[in-house]
Amino acid sequence: MAITIPTQIEKCKGAMLATAIGDALGWPNEPRSKNRIEKPKVNDFFVEWTRSCKEPRWHDERILPGEYSDDTQMTLSVARSIIVGDWERFLAEKELPFWLRYERGGGGALLKAARSINDKKELLWQSPYHAKAYFSAGGNGAAMRILPHVIANANRADISALMLDVIKDTLITHGHPRAFLGATCYAFALDYLLRKDTVLEYGELVSAVIDGQQSWGAFPNHDVFGQ
């Protein structure tokens, strides 16, 4: 039986949808999800659960089946920013501060970055009080939101443009090299899958990522924002 390879448009739609689905399925089981159940049962379907929150005051938040976390929220924020244009400025000055009004499950680095822009109109690396925390932020918050950049750069032959966009995005919230490498590595893998027009062989993606480390692991231009 012949296998039909999805078109790039179908892959993009599927990836965006799968992002939200995977987020909604996995969020209750994350160690930092603040799930009231300490060891929740892992399910392959959406569940309702209760999350313990402390902002603006201690309370229990009801999470309905299929609702997603900050990972999908920020993915959509990046997508909207790209659609609007001048995405770096729109993401940092509009989307990120406004996200504080509806955020769910945001990590420490992301929250600090958003609050710094919202309260002081400055990025974390511009603040002498937050520089240490910023350059120690090596989580996967940036990697979780870079899918829209892969989609936006799908028609470009040179992957360096995608890597630059991912680095710019990461810079807004994270400063540790691990955060950059995680985001660029993941973006490279997604880009490879998007361009693949035959059935993926066993181990092929791992080999492709290893072989492509000169692309996703390259030292970036020190002045990526042109400032």
State where each predicted segment sits.
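Structured, active/binding-site neighborhoods that engage oxygen-rich ligands
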Residues: 1-227
